[in-house]
Amino acid sequence: MSDISKLSGCGTALVTPFNEDLSIDEAALRRFVEFQISEGINFLVPCGTTGESPTLSDAEQRRVVEIVVEVANRRVPVIAGAGGNNTAHVIKLARECERLGANGLLSVTPYYNKPTQEGLYQHFKAIAEATTLPIILYNVPPRTNVNLLPDTVARLAEIPNIIGVKEASGDISQIAEIINRVPASFRVLSGDDSMTLPLISVGGVGLISVASNELPAGLTRLTTACLENRWEEARRLNRELFALMKLNFIETSPAPLKAALAMMGKIKEVARLPIVPVRPETRDKLRAALRELKLI
């Protein structure tokens, strides 16, 4: 599964399980990847925001990618997170991910230093020139304070190994404009579970999901129903899953997600600062939602 040029469907933005001493829980990670694949997920995305990549050292990021690639064993593509606001450092990460056997990269827009659209273009162009791996851009303005605009996405889509964008702007008009501006082969994916249905309805091809950590089969069914134009079923699934989608962000992600996965017995409820445990009332809401979906 090395060719992701036609990537579609649902991929999980994987959590990174930790032990109580804050080290990576490698055994839990291995089990979790196997769980995801057994439930029918289409691809895996380690070391993104949900994986707490800002708090992982370079060595830890390499180890997480190495484990996920090893356990996946070519059954599903592995698209490794390799982003940041230091272009030279991102290039280093990208090359490491390529060496470790990742099938592609997910690279978030530079945050905090607020580059211009030309700066964003040059940043991603430099990364693309430094690796042979296919790259999926990641636009998430609520987190980065910078918006990758349709003009810039269209320019970047001309670079051969920039093959898609994970869009989490929440602006369906912007997403539709991107889809209308890029080649048909360019992969536009939702970066927000709750935007999957509208994004695919205007021509998107899939989802990089947070909620699929808890319910990979359910989010895969939703995405597939949308892609196959089974809109009545898609709307029903969206209604069933919507509460969980939103609860995962009721406090700073991935704290609610890790609390839910701990209730499900998948991982320990351990995150690294500055992420802190959820409040008791949030825990109660999560427990109720998981029971409603028969996940606990």
Which sequence ranges carry the predicted segments?
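C-terminal alpha-helical cap/extension of soluble enzyme domains
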Residues: 2, 6-17, 35, 39-41, ...
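Alpha-helical structural signal in soluble globular domains
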Residues: 63, 67-72, 96, 100, ...
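Catalytic alpha/beta core domains of metabolic enzymes, predominantly
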Residues: 129-130, 141-249
